[in-house]
Curated annotation (Swiss-Prot):
This protein's name: Beta-sesquiphellandrene synthase
Protein's GO biological process: defense response; diterpenoid biosynthetic process
A matching Pfam family: Terpene_synth
Segment forming the signal sequence: none
InterPro entries: Isoprenoid_synthase_dom_sf (IPR008949), Terpene_cyclase-like_1_C (IPR034741), Terpene_cyclase_plant_C1 (IPR044814), Terpene_synth_N (IPR001906), Terpene_synth_N_sf (IPR036965), Terpene_synthase-like (IPR050148), Terpene_synthase_metal-bd (IPR005630), Terpenoid_cyclase/PrenylTrfase (IPR008930)
Outcome when changing residue 405 to L: Changed product specificity and production of mainly zingiberene
Length: 545
């Protein structure tokens, strides 16, 4: 494998690394001042939500017409209420799958396809072919059907040309009619064109959809009130978590000891909440936020700040994971490293005696990470650009951090996650390879201009430019095509029967959704001012009941 011309010189690398700074935290101690509602008020909210939940359950159980069933399930999903009725929804979808329906109604066909595929039914996309004319264009009479087809088509797998064609057709049509639509439908179309329904971060979809649903003429007031209370109760829990995590973060004293890193603890919790938003995943959010904090610190030390020698010493200490390894490290790394070991011990305590063995996997995940970082440092120092994207991804998909964060999320879950499942996850199965490839490619598109000037190893974008002699624009467009391919890969795996619990693939897909959100327009984690309003919407602004 021949060395290619350097992206930048070693002296440039070292100089830029030492001078690099990121903007400070946008949140500081904001969540330390959080005051929960009084106990009576919280109790009233919880009791009222419980009453409404059972009223909605009656609606779910009494639904018996295909269109009404589909509309109800979609509404509950978008409002973040579907997890309260999993068994009932599964029964209804089984009924829908086995029942006759009007296959000439494009809106119904699209919604049926969308919900069945979303729940793992491998239904055929051939149902859409009858809506095409001789030229291959779709015959669609109304915008609602157009939007339903657009959303359904994004649950495609490889080889489904009818869905590929549907996306191109519907996107063009929706863009052309957007300015003429009434407000509520225009809001829906705008959201869809930004991110199709299946790929949206679920808790953000809930927060965004509540005010849209409130404007709908056909809204159900009981469902609406329950959705608002359910979200507000979750928001209170998130704020409690943020208060504890901010206190934990302050003890690390990053402003003094690690002033060069990205101080993004609130954004980290936001990211983890996007992937694991349910009440029962509180411990999961806490563990994964802390793991993400350490991944960020390791990344910023090894990729941006340290010398090669310092980075290798840190890697060796991570491999050892023992207190006396701190003696190897430069002074600025020692406190962080010892705090990492302390965190492992505290997580053991939080997990309890029957699940404390899982901390072993957190340590192994960090070892895999720094092994990859070490290889990337070698590439950088040798001025090496991998000859193909595949060669690049063999290392870089493991260093984007998505593998570590996704796997660590399962450490905090219930007894459904066994040692055998954690061993399987650590073996890097196809599902995780597809997801981490997607995250790496998305990250590289968003970060490539910044990292071109920052003394980094070559990204997949630069690798493609070197391999094919293209411009940065053309390379980014090609990488975007590859991200679409990874979505198809993940969808195929989602539809493939497996012995693993459904929560595994659902969570992995949720991490892909959060990554798409974070890297959609820029690297929103690094430049977090771009998502400050969204974070406030999720954590600070309750819905008005």
């Amino acid at each position: 494998m021949a060395l290619t011309p350097s992206v930048c010189s070693i002296s440039d690398v070292q100089g830029l690394q030492k001078d690099r700074t990121f903007h400070p935290s946008l949140w500081g101690d904001f969540f330390l001042t959080y005051q929960p509602p009084t106990a009576p008020k919280h109790a009233y909210m919880a009791e009222r939500a419980e009453v409404l939940k059972e009223e909605v359950r009656k609606m779910v159980k009494s639904a018996n017409e295909i269109q009404n069933i589909l509309d109800l399930i979609l509404t509950l999903q978008r409002l973040g209420l579907d997890n309260h009725y999993e068994n009932e929804i599964n029964e209804l979808l089984s009924f829908v799958h086995d029942s006759d329906y009007d296959d000439k109604d494009l809106n119904l066909v699209s919604l049926r396809f969308y919900l069945l595929r979303k729940h793992g039914y491998d239904v055929s996309s051939d149902v859409f072919k009858c809506f095409q004319d001789k030229e291959g264009n779709f015959v669609v009479k109304d915008t609602k059907s157009l939007l339903s087809l657009y959303n359904a088509a994004h649950l495609r797998i490889h080889g489904e040309e009818v869905l590929d064609e549907a996306i191109i057709f519907t996107r063009g049509k929706l863009e052309s009619v957007l300015d003429s639509l009434e407000t509520t439908l225009a809001d829906e179309v705008t959201l869809a064109l930004q991110t199709p329904l299946f790929r949206r971060v679920r808790i953000l979809e809930t927060r965004n959809y509540i005010p849209i649903y409130e404007k709908e003429v056909a809204r159900n007031e009981v469902i609406l009130e329950f959705a608002k209370l359910n979200f507000n109760l979750l928001q209170l829990l998130y704020c409690e978590e943020l208060k504890m995590i901010t206190l934990w973060w302050k003890q690390l004293n990053v402003e003094t000891n690690l002033s060069f890193i990205r101080d993004r603890i609130v954004e980290m919790h936001f990211w983890m909440t996007g992937a694991c938003s349910e009440k029962k995943y509180s411990l999961t959010r806490t563990i994964t936020t802390k793991m993400t904090a350490y991944i960020t610190i390791l990344d910023d030390i090894m990729d941006t700040h340290s010398t090669t020698e310092e980075a290798m010493l840190l890697a060796e200490a991570i491999y050892r994971c023992e207190e006396n390894a701190a003696e190897l490290l430069p002074e600025y790394m020692k406190d962080f490293y010892l705090y990492l070991l302390k965190t492992f011990d505290s997580v053991k305590h939080e997990l309890g005696p029957n699940r404390s063995f899982r901390v072993f996997y957190l340590k192994e995940l960090l070892k895999i990470l720094v092994r990859g970082y070490s290889q990337e440092i070698k590439w950088r120092d040798e001025h090496y650009v991998p000859e193909t994207i595949d060669e690049h991804l063999e290392v870089s998909k493991a260093t984007v951090g998505a593998f570590q964060v996704a796997c660590s999320s399962f450490v905090g879950m219930g007894d459904i996650i066994t040692k055998e499942i954690l061993d399987w996850l650590l073996s890097y199965p196809k599902l995780l390879k597809s997801m981490t490839t997607f995250v790496r490619l998305s990250n590289d598109i968003a970060s490539t201009k910044r990292e071109q000037t920052g003394g980094h190893h070559a990204s997949t974008v630069q690798c493609y430019m070197m391999q094919h002699g293209t411009t940065i624009h053309d390379a980014c467009e090609k990488i975007k095509e590859l991200t679409e391919d990874t979505w198809k890969d993940m969808m195929k795996l989602y539809l493939t029967p497996t012995e693993q619990p459904k929560v595994i693939i659902q969570t992995v897909l949720d991490f892909a959704r959060t990554a798409e959100f974070m890297y959609k327009k820029t690297d929103a984690f690094t430049f977090s001012h771009t998502i400050k309003d969204t974070i406030a919407l999720l954590f600070v602004e309750p819905t008005l009941v």
